Amino acid sequence: METKIKKQRSLYIPYAGPVLLEFPLLNKGSAFSIEERRNFNLLGLLPEVVESIEEQAERAWIQYQGFKTEIDKHIYLRNIQDTNETLFYRLVQNHLDEMMPVIYTPTVGAACERFSEIYRRARGVFISYQNRHNMDDILQNVPNHNIKVIVVTDGERILGLGDQGIGGMGIPIGKLSLYTACGGISPAYTLPVVLDVGTNNQQLLNDPLYMGWRNPRITDDEYYEFVDEFIQAVKQRWPDVLLQFEDFAQKNAMPLLNRYRDEICSFNDDIQGTAAVTVGTLIAASRAAGSQLSEQKIVFLGAGSAGCGIAEQIIAQTQREGLSEEAARQKVFMVDRFGLLTDQMPNLLSFQTKLVQKRENLQHWDSESEVLSLLDVVRNVKPDILIGVSGQTGLFTEEIIREMHKHCPRPIVMPLSNPTSRVEATPQDIIAWTEGNALVATGSPFAPVAWKDKIYPIAQCNNAYIFPGIGLGVIASGASRITDEMLMSASETLAKYSPLVLNGEGLVLPELKDIQTVSRAIAFAVGKMAQQQGVAVKTSAEALQQAIDENFWQAEYRDYRRTSI
């Protein structure tokens, strides 16, 4: 798809002098022209040389390389972001392969754990339970009036690291950075939010540097009433905003999604975004093998909201390929810490009940135990696909992977848990245990694997392939809701850009250098589906593409003109 770069018009702004230099969205640093320095009272406040953004980015890249640890690199990049956002995004886009793991997973996990220690400057909105009666005032304090995308967390389930309290703010900040870097959504349109409802992390409560509300987490009615107050305040201030729920605990994630998805344009990336990118990956892998997803047998390790969300979207896709719902569900097997989910299991969660296997259908299985372990399931199902969303390291053992490979010559193994310390098995081990025959996709980034004189590229099943395009598509089309069909169209579009499908070799997912192209294509597919579903005003394909082009922000400086407040 051709990328059209819109001409940048001059920007009229009222700020000048040091105030302008302290405004990250407007600051150009040494790139202010001589005329701008005169007009905005900047003469003498900057070094003599006027630099281009590429010259600035080259200096920043040299400085970045001087940092030895990933967390120090993260802190450095966040400092640039809080000083000069345009430069930050130009730098990140120039080095996306290198910097995406630093600004988001896996490094963002450490940044969340150390949030209060490494805190430098305010970004986003912190809404504590103590301030619940000031919700409208808090949102009125947001300086950017035209907010189009909000990412909100309550910090309770940050990646695989658990309760990080307000340290969870690192996730919305990082996520929105990818909305801009990958999806071209202007940073001026984005807002990270953390709902500070306390923390049950005793280490944080005992930490003298912890900056959040020092109180155990509120629960039950108090919690849901507080979240509802936030949603209503958002609807009042920005009625057309896209709201993304991020890293809420399993007990709250699905109820909140179900409660609000038809009230405000919203989605949960952990459930729906992860499902969409996983399904897109599996569609591509199946096509590359000359088959369809509906022909595969799939085993999950992890039956939480994320795992069940992926499973439901796989079932929906296989139904689109011709299976009945019953046949589709019989091909998906969910294993959690209590074993295979069956209809005789007590205390199932509501979203798990449709994903059980009937115990009567398992009587012929080769197992002496009442609890059917992952190994039992792999041995009896003989799956083609194994997906890990358990958040527990090392659970894909050599015995399990070799048992899978015994019955499947080209297994697809996807250890998706984040961060890397929580991955079910490393790509290196999976490749070795399958004699180089496995197709591996992970949730966190891994280097290519060298095994027996051959290099195996490892695809990262990164939600960043999906959610930036969804956001751009929603903004461009004016969609009022995000439907399951819109998510499915994103998966289908992602699969079309697989190098393995297009060329018969290479990664199952596109290279990161192509992610803006993929995001624009997903935006078009999502916007078109929104129109077909009646949640966006119908336009021509040309008009939709023009809206995408016009909303696609470029990390380039604009000329400034002085105006009064």
UniProtKB/Swiss-Prot annotation:
Its cofactor is Mg(2+); Mn(2+). Transmembrane segments: none annotated. Divalent metal cations. Prefers magnesium or manganese. InterPro entries: Aminoacid_DH-like_N_sf, Malic_enzyme_CS, Malic_N_dom, Malic_N_dom_sf, Malic_NAD-bd, Malic_OxRdtase, NAD(P)-bd_dom_sf, NAD_malic_enz_proteobac. Keywords: Metal-binding, NAD, Oxidoreductase. Its EC number is 1.1.1.38. GO terms for cellular component: cytosol. The record marks D270 as: Important for activity. GO terms for molecular function: malate dehydrogenase (decarboxylating) (NAD+) activity; metal ion binding; NAD binding; oxaloacetate decarboxylase activity. NAD(+) binds at R157, D270, N418. One of its GO terms (biological process) is malate metabolic process. A divalent metal cation binds at E246, D247, D270. It catalyses: (S)-malate + NAD(+) = pyruvate + CO2 + NADH; oxaloacetate + H(+) = pyruvate + CO2. The active site is at Y104 (proton donor), K175 (proton acceptor). PANTHER family: MALIC ENZYME-RELATED, NAD-DEPENDENT MALIC ENZYME, MITOCHONDRIAL. Belongs to the malic enzymes family. Homotetramer. This is NAD-dependent malic enzyme. It comes from Citrobacter koseri (strain ATCC BAA-895 / CDC 4225-83 / SGSC4696).
